[in-house]
Every structure is written in structure tokens, then in C-alpha cells.
Amino acid sequence: MTVHYLNGKDSGLFKPLTISNGKITLEHRVVHAPLTRNRGEPLNHSSTPDHPNRIWIPGDAVVEYYSQRATKGGLIISEGIPPSLESNGMPGVPGLFNSEQAAGWKRVVNAVHAKGGIIFCQLWHAGRATIPQMTGSPAVCPSASVWDSPTECYSHPPVGSTQSVLYASHPPIEMTVEHIKQTIDDYCNAAKTAMDIGFDGVEIHSGNGYLPEQFLSSNINKRDDAYGGTPEKRCQFVFELMEQVAKTIGEQNVAIRLSPFGMFNQARGEQRIETWTHLCEGLKKTLPSLSYVSFIEPRYEQIFGAEEKDKFLKSWGLLDVTLDRFRQIFGSTPFFSAGGWDDQNSWGVVESGKYDALLYGRYFTSNPDLVHRLKEKIPMAPYDRTRFYGPFEDNTFHYTDYPTVDQN
């Protein structure tokens, strides 16, 4: 029998959802995904090759962007915010480790709250996915693991250059235990600042091949101490990080983002099911009151053809790459999904019980009124992929200048 699900305003997407262990009630389940846009303003405007600017703050354009996309009772997850200079992975990304940055993010928070919206701060540590020209220090990693491909380049040329930088030219250093503890402290300090300036919660980015997932990935983490060597030990960093952040700001204010089947930034470790099952079971046991968990859908069609994909998954023993097992582990914890949702494939997902909320990214860039469009079944404006990632001379073009339906 064919099941017909309602769409638009009658969809389950527009039913309330409680997160943060009952502290917050969302009025709808259309969530703004964390989107790096590289539109921050440099703290040092006289950046030179010898003295490059390495710190960015949220300026007027960033405030306007978030304000445009805020809705009453709607959740926005911020772009990835570095908790330290060392953690910064890209130019134009405002961090949260000095007073100027905190003041800028407070303006963003206030703008979202003025619209009745809710905003979480996503903390993001690039780990080995950066270069010394960006941070002023060597990239860090669980192990001194070079990138698999010797031709893999950093995303942006350094200040004063048009030449791409090879990651292989700047191999990461292995983190000492003391360095690991300091990094966790950096996260905790940034999380406390986030709550102090009004963010409604903090999400720890533990996917997409960044530092936490580097610890989880056997092809990157070659340690043989408490932080590596087995699936269980490779989870230890994330366990400690989440527990310490929860102690700092309250468990109900903490969320996590995971990509168990992703391969971004060459996170191509094995024992996927064993590792992420142990991780999720441990998180559910030790932190049962997390605000929510957010998962990135496996989308191998973007990397492989059908035959190549099946061959690859079989080589890993991965015949089932759905998120169902993790949904079952987390039970009543609100479970979010990101990965290609639009105005065609969103309907019936919440009603089926598969996920509690859906994250939208690319279409939010070009549709500041995306929630209204979904609700009223109005077609989406196309996005401009060439303007996803700045910085640009004009940071507002195809960032804050997209009109709403009413403005059209």
C-alpha cells in the first residue's frame, strides 16, 4: 500500500520539537545547517606576507546573514567556529578565542534572538587540515600522518601569493597528551564564552575529517597509547572532549555532529561500524541528556559510480551504510540528518520516525526565507556554488543580497 505524506505547512516538518532535555522547544524542524562561508572581517587590515592576518571577526555582513535566516522558534547552527588560533582551518572564518570575536558573535546572537530564533555555536578544530601560514604554528594531528595524496592542496593560497600550498609540504605534528588536554581546555573555554554571550547551546563538530574524526580514523590515528590502537581507544578523545564540555556548560546544552561513513579530508579509516557504534553507545550512556545529535548522510554517489561504490563498500565490509543503527542507539535523543534535503525529498521523513529534524545548507544560502518557502510550497531559488566560500572583495554578493519571495 502506498503511503501518502502531507507536505508544506501540514508536514511533520512544521510540528514542534523539544531539544536540550526539555529546555528548548523548536516551533519547526527545518534547521539551518552549519555553513562555512568565509565572510569574516580581518582583525588586522594591513595583512602582508610577512605579517599575515590570522584572526577574523563577525562583521556587519555576518550579522545580517544570520538575521535574514532566523525564524521564530527556528534553530540555526552557526558556521564552524575555531576555539583557538591553532584550530583555524580557513581564512575569513571568525573564531571565538578573543574579546573582539566574542563581541562580534554576540551581535549575531542578539540579531537571531530579536527574530525569535535559536542559535547554537558549532566549535570546529581543523586538526591537520590547515597550514602554518594560517595559524602561525604547525598543523596538529593525533599522529604525524601525511595526507594520502601528495598532490592534495590547501584550499586558499597564502597572503600575497596565487600559488596553492601542498599539504605534503607541511606535515602535521603528533599531539602530546599535554597538547590534547590543552586542546580540550580550548574547546571548554570557547564553549563557556559562547554561553556567556547568549548562544543557546554548543555543537561539537566531530565529522568531515577534522580533528575529532582524525582521532576516530585508523588511517590517520596511528597512536598506540590511550588514544589509539583499537576502535575503543580511538574514541577516547571524543569521549573526553564531550564530557569536559558538558561539565563546563551543562550536558543539556551540548550537541555533536558525526559523519560515520564520510571520507572528507581523507578520513578513510576502517572498522567504521565498530568505531562509531562504540562511540555512540558510549555517548548515550555517559551523556544521556545531550541536546541533540546530528549526522551527515552517506552520499558516495558524489565520489563513486554505482559499481565502484559497491566494490569499495564491500572491501570495508560495509553493506549497510544507513544511519538506522545510530538512530536506534540514541533512542529518544533528538536525531538530526544533513545531506541533500530539498523541497522534493523532505516530505514524510519526520512522520516515518527516521529523523526528528532535517538540516538544510546549500538552499539556505540562496533562500533566506527557506522556511517560508517549504511551508507554503514555493519553489527554491537556485544557489551559486561559486560564492559558497569567500573571502571576496565584495563579501555581500550572493551572501546577503538574495531576495525573499515577498521582496520579489
State where each predicted segment sits.
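Flavin-dependent oxidoreductase catalytic cores
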Residues: 1-408
